[in-house]
């Protein structure tokens, strides 16, 4: 990890194996298509998936077999544009959507490109991520930031896009009650988006009191710390303490924890909607009887799709969602590994890594 930032062309933070990272100077990527742009990356957030690859070397079927650049929550400044680019120019500040679909398969043509089987997603093996000085994207996957959104905030458009997709999957409407399990970055942003969509009650659930305290200050109308009792008992408490009557309209799970899934199913009203946004173990026990007899709508949510990033930028630009308060630390590029260690230790909410300084 000794490569000099002063002489490097495209210094990159590379994962070689479990807890094995290095700074490597790589060639500046070429524009492969006339619609491509070269982005000078300015800020990158550390995501739980990045930490998981660093800790375990894999996520499910995605295994790091070759050295891979980490990072996918980024913002930057346009450094070069292809000959067919019309919507961006050198110097524009952008949020970067880090997955490129094939654009030809049925999900892509149906507007669900997040389900594309040929998706080239940053920092998902075998594709390199954005923790480098430069990164290439198609122009339509770069979203120009208005003047009132900073580049630091721009890096949070990625997790906000995830939250927007989850809340849209839930079809949250004004006046509804929404329970969000998991008060990490995505769960907190789900609370904020649900509030922007007009939800009347937004209840954040977590086992860590500091997270709940922040959630209450941030966007939740109330919070709930589960007791070490059955899911049915926790659901009963949730309903009574929050005057939910027969149950909540919407449950969003951003934790992936099996007890949260169980409690979420039991706390919903008949005909309610459940959206699974958090990933945990690949298989869990599931309260199928409650789901069936209450005729619940159950949906999964994966990354983000058509319109989600645009809406995310719009929510922040209009002041309806605040992402600035989630940024609890910014470190220099050469301290990237230490930042990963701190995130793994649960310090802060969202840590950003600053890009290479010219």
From Swiss-Prot:
Record has Cell membrane as a keyword: no
Q: What is its EC number?
A: 1.1.1.9
Spell out the molecular function terms from Gene Ontology: D-xylulose reductase activity; L-iditol 2-dehydrogenase (NAD+) activity; zinc ion binding
Q: Which CDD domains match?
A: sorbitol_DH
Q: In which pathway does it act?
A: Carbohydrate degradation; L-arabinose degradation via L-arabinitol; D-xylulose 5-phosphate from L-arabinose (fungal route): step 4/5
Q: Which cofactor does it need?
A: Zn(2+)
Where is NAD(+) bound in this sequence? 182-187
Stored Pfam families: ADH_N, ADH_zinc_N
Show the catalytic activity: xylitol + NAD(+) = D-xylulose + NADH + H(+)
- Claim: NAD is one of the keywords in the record: yes
Q: How is the cofactor bound?
A: Binds 1 zinc ion per subunit.
Q: Which UniProt keywords apply?
A: Carbohydrate metabolism, Metal-binding, NAD, Oxidoreductase, Xylose metabolism, Zinc
- The UniProt record gives the binding positions of Zn(2+) as 47, 72-73
List GO BP terms, alphabetically.
D-xylose metabolic process; L-arabinose catabolic process to xylulose 5-phosphate; sorbitol catabolic process
What's the stated role of this polypeptide?
Xylitol dehydrogenase which catalyzes the conversion of xylitol to D-xylulose. Xylose is a major component of hemicelluloses such as xylan. Most fungi utilize D-xylose via three enzymatic reactions, xylose reductase (XR), xylitol dehydrogenase (XDH), and xylulokinase, to form xylulose 5-phosphate, which enters pentose phosphate pathway.
Name the family.
Belongs to the zinc-containing alcohol dehydrogenase family.
Name of the featured protein: Probable D-xylulose reductase A
- The protein's organism comes out as Neosartorya fischeri (strain ATCC 1020 / DSM 3700 / CBS 544.65 / FGSC A1164 / JCM 1740 / NRRL 181 / WB 181)
Q: In the record, what lineage is assigned to the organism producing the protein?
A: Eukaryota, Fungi, Dikarya, Ascomycota, Pezizomycotina
The gene designation is: xdhA
């Amino acid at each position: 990890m000794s490569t000099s930032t002063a002489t490097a062309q495209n210094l990159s933070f590379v994962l070689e194996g479990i807890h094995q990272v290095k700074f490597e100077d790589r060639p500046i990527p070429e524009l492969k298509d006339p619609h491509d742009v070269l982005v000078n990356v300015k800020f990158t957030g550390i995501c739980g998936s990045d930490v998981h690859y660093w800790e375990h070397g894999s996520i499910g079927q995605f295994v790091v077999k070759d050295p891979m650049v980490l990072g996918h929550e980024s913002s930057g400044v346009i450094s070069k544009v292809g000959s067919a680019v019309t919507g961006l120019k050198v110097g524009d500040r952008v949020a970067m959507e880090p997955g490129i679909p094939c654009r030809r398969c049925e999900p892509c043509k149906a507007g669900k490109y997040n389900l594309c089987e040929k998706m080239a997603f940053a920092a998902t093996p075998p594709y390199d991520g954005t923790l480098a000085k430069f990164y290439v994207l198609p122009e339509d996957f770069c979203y120009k930031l208005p003047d009132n959104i900073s580049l630091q905030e721009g890096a949070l458009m990625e997790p906000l896009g995830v939250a927007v997709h989850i809340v849209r999957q839930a079809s949250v409407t004004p006046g509804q009650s929404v329970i969000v399990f998991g008060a990490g970055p995505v769960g907190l942003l789900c609370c904020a988006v649900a509030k922007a969509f007009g939800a009347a009650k937004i209840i954040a659930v977590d086992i860590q009191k500091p997270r709940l305290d922040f959630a209450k200050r941030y966007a939740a109308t109330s919070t709930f710390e589960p007791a070490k009792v059955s899911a049915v008992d926790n659901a009963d408490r949730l309903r009574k303490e929050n005057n939910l009557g027969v149950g909540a309209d919407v449950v969003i799970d951003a934790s992936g924890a099996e007890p949260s899934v169980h409690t979420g199913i039991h706390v919903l009203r008949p005909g309610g909607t459940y959206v699974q946004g958090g990933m945990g173990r690949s298989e869990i026990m599931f309260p199928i009887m409650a789901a069936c007899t209450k005729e619940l709508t159950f949906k999964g949510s994966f990354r983000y799709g058509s319109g989600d990033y645009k809406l995310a930028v719009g929510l922040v630009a209009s002041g309806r969602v605040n992402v600035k308060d989630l940024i609890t630390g910014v470190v220099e590029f050469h301290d990237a590994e230490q930042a990963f260690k701190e995130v793994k230790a649960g310090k802060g909410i969202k840590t950003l890594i600053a890009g290479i300084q010219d």
